[in-house]
Amino acid sequence: ECVELVDDLYKFRDCYFETHSLDDATRKTSDVAQQMEQTLKKMEEQEQSLKHKAEFLLQKGRCLNVAQDFSAVAEECLSRAVKLEPGLVDGWNALGEQYWKKGDMIGARNCFTGALQQKKNKVSLRNLSMVLRQLPAPDSDSAGKQVLESVDLASQAVAMDEQDGTSWYILGNAYLSLFFTSGQNQQFSTKAFSAYAQSEKVDKVASSSPELHFNRANLFQYEEMFSSALAGYSRAAALDPSWAELTAKEKQLLEYLEKVTELAENKGKVKARRLRTMLSNLSSSALGPCSSPQFRSPSGRVGSLEPVTLSSLKHGHNAGVAALGKVVFSLASEGRMAFTFGMVDSEETCMVVTVYNTANSWGVLIGDSVVIPEPLLKRHSITHKDKTFDFKSIRVDSPLLLIVNGKKQNIHSQIVTSISYRPQHE
């Protein structure tokens, strides 16, 4: 009966929004805590009649483990339970989650590994996947191996039960990490999106996980899918109003889009006379190495590039050509994922440019001449709540691809972006 009581408690927590509206989100933590206290009371009434001490300790530990934060009492109950009965896989898993909550990743790893030695199970596999991504690695090679192993463990968890949304979600996070440790290989962001979608599809509980919406929104923002990012941050904030970072992310992204569109429309607010002077010394000599027949483009094409106007660029990748203009504004926004600037060409067309993987010290100044070899043009049409944004931009994946004032950029101008995502606090 104790097992049923605790299972019901977890069901209450995980299916909270099936019986409550989003307006109750602020009460969820206290409602779960109240339910936990009631469950403990009922369990303690039955304690005397229980013959198996280890089983009672396990269920009491599981009950306390329902809360987001570390519980010393839970740790003690679970430690005693697995000492009495080392074969209790659920005990090892719950104890590992307690170590995770107090930040002891080595202790957590040992528990999940120990549980797997008793019996292969999806909970240990996916939890170990999470732990491996949080463990510090001595060097980038080891870090890469840890992330690959993390993907493998989460995949094994999914294979054991394809209807478990939590395993799919953790696989999504593993692919998200792999995307950033593998030089931002597009196939891994696609796999992350696909795992997140599967998590929602197979499991109603997963779709009310604020972490899923937040982590996916981070990836949407990096991929410049701004409408989806805003919707994700907004949904996550509604599901967990106590998590301040969420409302901040949504607000930051909206402010960024407002600023960018306003600056692009006003050509960086540069006065007409100054703009004419700036553009008068914009010549094809600014092309620098791009004008050489030996120039190797990012796509691998060898040969000089033809300078073209911004208005003549087509949607997507523009092979064999280079966009050329003067910087009229730059923006290194708070919580930024990209260095953003605006450039104006000889026709006085203004274009937003987003540059990724930039070192904090790197930037361009108003008046600089910038050449973008084989530009990637994107069109944004964004609607969120009562706001709409419509603009075009050029995405550049590294400052090393740009020619500024006729020169290639120094290797130190690039630092590979990593994304901060919130691991599930299970």
Can you describe what each PLM-predicted range is?
Residues 45-48, 80-83, 113-117, 152-159, ...:
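Conserved structural position within tetratricopeptide repeats
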Residues 357-373:
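Short nucleic-acid-contacting surface segments enriched for D/E, G, S/T with interspersed K/R
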Residues 56, 91, 124-125, 167, ...:
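TPR alpha-solenoid repeat register
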Residues 53, 88, 121-122, 164, ...:
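Residue-level recognition of tetratricopeptide repeat
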Residues 318, 328-357:
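OB-fold (S1/OB) nucleic-acid-binding surfaces
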Residues 68-69, 103, 136, 145, ...:
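Residue-level detector of the short coil/turn that links helix A to helix B
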